[in-house]
């Protein structure tokens, strides 16, 4: 079964996505995968407010957002607060290692999103390189942990 509840060191996720259909699908997929999605927001400003007010373990973040803030700005703030960042965007930037652990390219399926989140979880919680995920670029390096 693809969607199953399982123990996780990531308890609370925040999704930042400006496309309503993608946001809905991502939220549903992650909730069915056993994650607690505390909110889904469409702008950097809303994301920063959630980061300031809530305990968040990981950020699922598009780089293109509604509002005036860029995804890179949000990722940098999240990283500075110790929040793991998985970029989910149309084209993964080569130079995002300073703001994210990995990037999943859109479009993606439900299984790819779950595998990508679990891969980031492996990096953060087990301090080891995860299995390769189709469509995902990894920035994290074990020696950096």
Locate the predicted segments by residue:
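Acidic, metal-coordinating helix/loop segments flanking the phosphotransfer/catalytic sites
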Residues: 2, 27, 40-58
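Conserved acidic carboxylate
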Residues: 17
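Short amphipathic alpha-helix used as the core "switch/output" element in two-component signaling
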Residues: 69-83
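Two-component/phosphorelay signaling modules centered on CheY-like receiver
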Residues: 20-39
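Non-catalytic signal-transmission and effector/linker regions of two-component phosphorelay proteins
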Residues: 1-12, 109-145
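Active-site residues of response regulator receiver
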Residues: 62-63
